[in-house]
A protein has these predicted regions:
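Conserved alpha/beta-hydrolase
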Residues: 43, 48-73
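Alpha/beta-hydrolase-fold enzymes
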Residues: 120-205
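Short beta-strand/loop motif that positions the catalytic acidic residue
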Residues: 242-244
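Catalytic active-site module of serine/aspartate enzymes centered on a nucleophile-bearing elbow/loop
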Residues: 267, 271-308
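Active-site glycine-rich loops that stabilize anionic/oxyanionic intermediates
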Residues: 35-39, 112, 246-247
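N-terminal cap/lid segment of alpha/beta-hydrolase-fold proteins
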Residues: 1-25
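Alpha/beta-hydrolase active-site loop
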Residues: 79-99
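Alpha/beta-hydrolase fold nucleophile elbow
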Residues: 101-112
Length: 308
């Protein structure tokens, strides 16, 4: 595997860090990854190692306000136009690597916050990709999201768009953690593998909190993608792989992801597969201790291979 880090001009000419991990031999396919909230693209190197062994190149970038990009070091925030800009950033990476390898089937993976970005991206570019992997996603009742948006808007008025508050911390992370009391850390809901959780918390490229503004943007996206007609404009022939832990509060312990599956089937999608993993929490890519992460990697390798 060969890794290349690079900097590119994102939407609005914002400089963003990206990387691509290339197989030693010919490129059979490309997987573009959009990472989750507060983390960065470098956390997917183990997954990329297995994919590159099969000739699948892996590319991605640190979302604005995340990872190696210039920003506040403790709070992830994408700026007032950041959600829309990030969708455009995703398309710039697609254009870059599809342009280099126009004959390689192109797949996209979105995890957590990245899953909601990907779901919106597919609505805008339904014909671009060969298949989509949507991991760590969910859906919530619209009225609940509206109430939360209103509360968060009061916090934006109080402390600003790019800052956070104790109430936003509670709504964004701590509520999820309540399901796993007694808790060792603020982030027990992410992963049951304590070694991996400690690695995440000690990673200087990971943020500790999200801004009130970014949380409001995420809630807005959750509302948009949660509408029953949200997938109507997608390519119904495109293979879709849904992945989630059965103990993931973002996916309502599996129930929300099943709801997404049923909605897609109702709208006539031909090839949707759901993988729910027992005893796995939100970050299925780092649940190594109970074997989930290895199963997830093997499934992705197999699924892409079957759809090339």
């Amino acid at each position: 595997m060969k890794r290349e880090d690079f900097v590119f001009n994102g939407s609005g000419d914002v400089r963003l860090h990206g990387c691509v991990l290339m197989p030693e031999n010919d490129v059979r396919a490309i997987l573009q990854i959009t990472h989750g909230m507060t983390e960065h693209i470098g956390r997917y190197e183990k997954l990329a190692e297995k994919l590159t062994e099969k000739g699948i190149a892996v590319c991605g970038f640190d979302l604005r306000g995340h990872g190696l990009n210039e920003s506040q070091m403790n709070i992830a925030t994408m700026g007032k136009d950041g959600w829309e800009a990030s969708l455009n950033d995703m398309h710039r990476i697609y254009s870059l690597f599809h342009g280099k390898y126009p004959d390689a089937p192109y797949f996209m993976l979105g995890f957590s916050l990245g899953s909601f970005l990907l779901r919106e991206y597919i609505s805008r570019h339904p014909k671009e990709m060969k298949g989509a992997i949507i991991a760590g996603t969910g859906c919530q009742p619209a009225f609940v999201l509206e109430i939360m948006k209103f509360i968060v808007s009061t916090q934006i008025a109080k402390n600003g768009f790019d800052d956070t508050t104790d109430l936003v911390r509670k709504l964004s992370f701590d509520t999820y953690n309540d399901k796993f009391k007694p808790c060792r850390t603020r982030f027990d809901w992410l992963c049951s593998d304590e070694a991996q959780l400690d690695e995440y918390m000690n990673d200087d490229a990971c943020r500790r909190d999200i801004s009130s503004g970014l949380f409001h943007q995420l809630l807005s996206s959750m509302k948009r993608t949660g509408q029953q007609h949200a997938c109507v404009g997608w390519n119904k022939e495109m293979p879709v792989l849904l992945m989630s832990g059965k103990d993931d509060p973002v996916g309502n312990m599996g129930k929300g992801v099943v709801q997404i599956l049923h909605n897609m089937e109702k709208h006539g999608f031909k090839d949707v597969k759901l993988c729910l993993y027992e005893k796995a929490r939100h970050d299925i890519f780092h649940e190594y201790e109970n074997g989930t992460a290895d199963k997830v990697t093997a499934e992705i390798v197999r699924w892409i291979g079957d759809n090339i």
